[in-house]
């Protein structure tokens, strides 16, 4: 499902118990300097990631100050994040002139400890090639390095490095719990383009070798991935970014099932298996 960009007024774009992706939660919070946003999400662990600007985050009296390194857009610096336990009372205060801050969440009933992930701790994976139109960079905020400290939530930022490139290919899905072949992970994306008048295409193919759906995605588009194979592409001449939220049903580690029709392409894309190993 595609949600076109709109002014959400700091209210969740993907709220708890969403009909399509009930394992996910997503909000975009926009604040001016000194403004405050308070929240608590029962039954969901969350992660606060400034897209732009700098904030302080207080979680039940534990303070994480000066979070965020980016100025004008998501290309302007490295990401940082703070993990907030399930149901915790969180206060975000804008410390820069303005901020746009993402709040990602996954359904989880246990209470863990809060922690921050600063830019030096971001786990970077780069794979693909310009020749195969799959050159991609992934910055894991809550990834394999945080395994054991987080319940079900995976948070990352994905950059399509080559202009006119593809992401999420070879096509894969993760909509059914059937280990060891696949896990169920609901997924939510928020897209940005450089320049911001760029756009792209999100495919969603429900069954192998049957026609699926395609969505025109623009700067600020949100996609809910509930079922099926889901590659996406950016127009030539533009770069694409998408903030990625994964919430697992029974485990945190993601097991992707690659589409049989295109599985041989796994052997043509440099470094792709290293990428797969990082979603743990």
Each language-model region and where it sits:
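A short glycine-rich, His/Asp/Glu-containing loop-to-beta-strand
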Residues: 6-38, 135-188
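Conserved hydrophobic/aromatic beta-strand scaffold that supports enzyme active sites
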Residues: 26-30, 81-83, 103, 155-159, ...
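Double-stranded beta-helix
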Residues: 98-138, 243-280
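Short, structured patches in soluble enzyme cores that scaffold and shape functional sites
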Residues: 86, 94, 103-107, 142-145, ...
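Glycine- and acidic-residue-biased ligand/ion/polar-headgroup-sensing regions
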Residues: 42-66, 163-164, 175-221, 233
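Acidic/histidine-enriched, beta-strand-rich ligand/metal-binding domains
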Residues: 197-280
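Conserved metal-binding segment of the jelly-roll/cupin
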Residues: 75-95, 106, 216-237
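Extended, compositionally biased flexible segments
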Residues: 27-28, 33-94
